[in-house]
Amino acid sequence: MTLVFDTKRAQGKPDDNRRPGGCCPFCDTAALGNIIRRDGDRIWLVNKFRTLRDTMQTIIIESSDHHGDISTYPREQNRGILRFALSCWNEMIRSGDYASVLMYKNFGPLSGGSLVHPHLQVVGLKHEDGYAALAPAHFEGIGVWAADRVRVTISTEPIMGFFEVNVIAPEGVAASGSPVDACTADRFADAIQVVVRYVLNEHHGGRATSYNLFFYHMDGSTVAKVMPRWVVSPYFVGYRLAQIN
């Protein structure tokens, strides 16, 4: 599976890493176009710079706070963002227009992202199966916590390594109207927040400045995988060999 990056479409794309101090397009909400849905300051819209061919690239602006993040949001705000994001992701999946739909978040200079303003990306792949290289073993491992049908594992067979934490909940709880499922969805959001805070503030002495957060539907579960990001190991780049520590 190979995605095609169109360099012409990337021309003029803002980049806080290479060109810091520029105007943030996500702060100027009055100028945003192609908005699909909004809920307060949470906005789902079509990505202006759709650089991948045969895809539909969309953005979820999480908050009006330019420097906000999962690690710093108040608990209720983080829960609301997760519910909104899951509903947007599932709407694209239910449309049936895509072979697969991916949702993920970049944070920090080593994450692969270009803008500081907090956002997630929801990308529909028209022809490719984004899960083709994944296996259930990538999401299992050492159990470290469980409550209210939510559990947390540390991968013993990571996708990339070195350290990948999985937060696992029953699929569909965020869309359910039942009080039990609502409690589970909140627990899911809270667990993700705890893991992200750990990755940024405690893991490796708090030296991580970047992370990725990936979402998957796997075998009746929704999984959030948190990865601290460092310079990528040559073992993975050249040989696809993951490492653990």
Q: Residue spans of the language-model regions?
A:
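Active-site microenvironments that recognize anionic phosphate/pyrophosphate groups
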Residues: 1-115, 123-187, 195-245
